[in-house]
Amino acid sequence: MKFFALFIYRPVATILLSVAITLCGILGFRMLPVAPLPQVDFPVIMVSASLPGASPETMASSVATPLERSLGRIAGVSEMTSSSSLGSTRIILQFDFDRDINGAARDVQAAINAAQSLLPSGMPSRPTYRKANPSDAPIMILTLTSDTYSQGELYDFASTQLAPTISQIDGVGDVDVGGSSLPAVRVGLNPQALFNQGVSLDDVRTAISNANVRKPQGALEDGTHRWQIQTNDELKTAAEYQPLIIHYNNGGAVRLGDVATVTDSVQDVRNAGMTNAKPAILLMIRKLPEANIIQTVDSIRARLPELQSTIPAAIDLQIAQDRSPTIRASLEEVEQTLIISVALVILVVFLFLRSGRATIIPAVAVPVSLIGTFAAMYLCGFSLNNLSLMALTIATGFVVDDAIVVLENIARHLEAGMKPLQAALQGTREVGFTVLSMSLSLVAVFLPLLLMGGLPGRLLREFAVTLSVAIGISLLVSLTLTPMMCGWMLKASKPREQKRLRGFGRMLVALQQGYGKSLKWVLNHTRLVGVVLLGTIALNIWLYISIPKTFFPEQDTGVLMGGIQADQSISFQAMRGKLQDFMKIIRDDPAVDNVTGFTGGSRVNSGMMFITLKPRGERSETAQQIIDRLRKKLAKEPGANLFLMAVQDIRVGGRQANASYQYTLLSDDLAALREWEPKIRKKLATLPELADVNSDQEDNGAEMNLIYDRDTMARLGIDVQAANSLLNNAFGQRQISTIYQPMNQYKVVMEVDPRYTQDISALEKMFVINNEGKAIPLSYFAKWQPANAPLSVNHQGLSAASTISFNLPTGKSLSDASAAIDRAMTQLGVPSTVRGSFAGTAQVFQETMNSQVILIIAAIATVYIVLGILYESYVHPLTILSTLPSAGVGALLALQLFNAPFSLIALIGIMLLIGIVKKNAIMMVDFALEAQRHGNLTPQEAIFQACLLRFRPIMMTTLAALFGALPLVLSGGDGSELRQPLGITIVGGLVMSQLLTLYTTPVVYLFFDRLRLRFSRKPKQAVTE
């Protein structure tokens, strides 16, 4: 009593306390960062190594394996995958959530150093690492185009000037430059001219290497001066290499230009990038795992004018893709939803109380509670994101509940003629314990979420804490500010109703009277109600088992990614044509705003595309509908497939895949893996639950297998080293010398001119100079035949791995796909040597599925414990929790009605319902117990009276919660696919529970009371006997 009086009789102190809470919240709001979701990125580090010309199998065995053995010893590595392709190896290390990325990077560098002695000596550079996940979609893509500068020059500007500057911006983890390669002097050899002059490819390589040398020359001194010696020992351009003498034939000089075409070109001509229909260089910017995407993008945008000034005016620097606009739009939608929810909740209060003065009180309490929460969010290191703002939206219904319960009880005493301050004190004292019970039991629901580990726990923690803090502040406000305002603002008389509201009042009275009559009948037919309650429990189980499930709702971020997978033997020229064809099909779609793409590098038969859709207001279809439409058009392109997927804010795993979900096959027997992977992939491709089924196993690339006749080689004076060097010189784009410039270093690249390598007859033109100086054709000591070879070799851990990726067709859920894959694996009879498991997001979904039921049970158990402690009873908490089955049925039915799968967001809704619907039972039980203790009423009379007295606040709190969630259901625009499942779950659960619990709770209360009496009599009878 004294606690409540302290605030009621000291209005200035109470007001200032509330003002202080509000001001702290405003300051916190201004300093909170903005993000699409809570920080849930796994720490990921990518290690890259190169050995130009090496086959994928050579890269896997000689580069990937030694590095994997060393990297695998690092503490905290949760997953290690690698992919080796032509001349390149990439290892992805995913660490535990709690692993510091900087500490992990130091360990990675130490592991690379430890493995250095085991790596091939011919590697042009040491392995490097980056603190970024290559499978993440870029947060921003910049493009460089020009009508006057070549692609190589544009690439040079991008990699030498722009990329290093952008990499230094806070939050940037990696800047990947694509679309071409660095400038280089390319030497295209003419095999016939070399043969005619008696010059070997090694002669040319040695001559060029010796002619371009950068060594110190020293200095000259006399008594008074010092001269630095400088020579023309370096060759910089193709024109300077052209007259280089590489050999003498019969006394005549053979110059490089006589046997080769020398051009200023690029290091790797098998690279191409485009934006819309124009050649372009792409800068794909990815953030650090712990970085805030909005802050990082804003920082990059702020530096763009400076970046533009560092490159020539003839180069056009543009933003081709930016993830931030849709994130900002989504958050604006949530903020609007929050404002609408607050307005609707206050409208509900006004309709029930029919008093402007009384409505002002919750209209003040709600904003104070919500705004004050921002301060706690800032102190906890949270952000303004979709989940935290949804928590505040849902909190509007919760925080007003406390104020409603206090306000309604005080108003009841005022209408009975009590003085305002006395009514405030008495009314608050009566319901103080009720409000405390409702708030503590609601917070208790979220305790299991706070203890939940892994990605789901990290994702839901911010939601749970935000909502719990809002409820805590609401509890304080409802017991301090609300009774004070009631005592000083409300009058000791019945409120004057506006004429237009009298009808609503009469309707509410009629509704209450009808409820009283129906309740009397129900209390006389308790068995029927008991059967209904048991039926709802059974229906819950059946609905949960049968409802489609997924991990997270499919988002429409306005950005699509596309992976191109072509025939494994396709040439680069043909692949570039495929890229152009696919980009034209997509660019012509009316919903597409911008398209960028690239192909080439170590995997010629693959490419990537990044598609920006028009804003949601300018298109009628969702991203998935657009993908479905484009899929039909893209299927007509022969020889290649383009797999599209909508970019999501949550991406798990480091595998770069052409679809959203992955299923990984592992084996220690590579032959078994290569045998079974095609069978499994073909089987999965026939399943209607899966779409865009593809695999990263590519072991049918065209290969020319050369077989040396070692006896003949020995007789002719040729060793294998010389023969292999010939092939590398001719076909490996071999980097034979370095050109040093002030800003960068460039290469001299040698190969047989592409004009002479159009078919396998090019091998017949190759020759080796033996130890006697004779030119020996390759065909004299080698035979060749076409064969198949892998384009890439993949590992997970230290096992061979193949990853099958898939998307979900419209109307199918991840649970449908998972079950279908499990059935298919069983039907195929896959041997034990080949192990299959879900990876990435699909793996997290499997883990979450296993813990969902446990989480719900833990929440119910926690609420039971808290209620048991508060009521000092084993029975009353069961009465209160009997409201849950009807809410569960309503939520699951609503999800099925709206064709929404059960996701992590829907799970949040179920958890919230556990806290919401029990409030009605708490109000009933509290007043029934009070009536039994002090009113000398029978249990049936007490619960009947409690139901009637609490009918108005029950309707108010339920409708407040319902109208608080309704804008989530009706919201459209950006991010609505995240909000709607939460709103659907809550609204469906509230409607069903409101219809049933007004009757089931009194019946359960009487059942347990009779059960208690029956057990309390038995000991007495035993003593009498």
UniProtKB/Swiss-Prot annotation:
Q: Which GO terms describe its molecular function?
A: xenobiotic transmembrane transporter activity
* Induction comment: The mdtABC operon is transcriptionally activated by BaeR.
Protein's membrane topology: Multi-pass membrane protein
Family that this chain belongs to: Belongs to the resistance-nodulation-cell division (RND) (TC 2.A.6) family. MdtC subfamily.
**Gene3D superfamilies in alphabetical order:** Multidrug efflux transporter AcrB pore domain (3.30.70.1440), Multidrug efflux transporter AcrB pore domain like (3.30.70.1320), Multidrug efflux transporter AcrB TolC docking domain, DN and DC subdomains (3.30.2090.10), Multidrug efflux transporter AcrB transmembrane domain (1.20.1640.10)
Q: Which domain of life is it from?
A: Bacteria
User: Any idea which UniProt keywords this protein has?
Assistant: Cell inner membrane, Cell membrane, Membrane, Transmembrane, Transmembrane helix, Transport
Q: Function, please?
A: The MdtABC tripartite complex confers resistance against novobiocin and deoxycholate.
Q: What gene is this protein translated from?
A: mdtC
Location relative to the cell: Cell inner membrane
Does Cell inner membrane count among this protein's keywords?
yes
- Which Pfam families does this entry report, sorted A to Z? ACR_tran
Q: What is the lineage of its organism?
A: Bacteria, Pseudomonadati, Pseudomonadota, Gammaproteobacteria, Enterobacterales
Q: What is this protein called?
A: Multidrug resistance protein MdtC
A GO CC annotation given for this chain: plasma membrane
Q: Self-association or partners: how does it assemble?
A: Part of a tripartite efflux system composed of MdtA, MdtB and MdtC. MdtC forms a heteromultimer with MdtB.
Regions crossing the membrane: 3-23, 333-353, 360-380, 387-407, 431-451, 463-483, 528-548, 853-873, 875-895, 897-917, 953-973, 984-1004
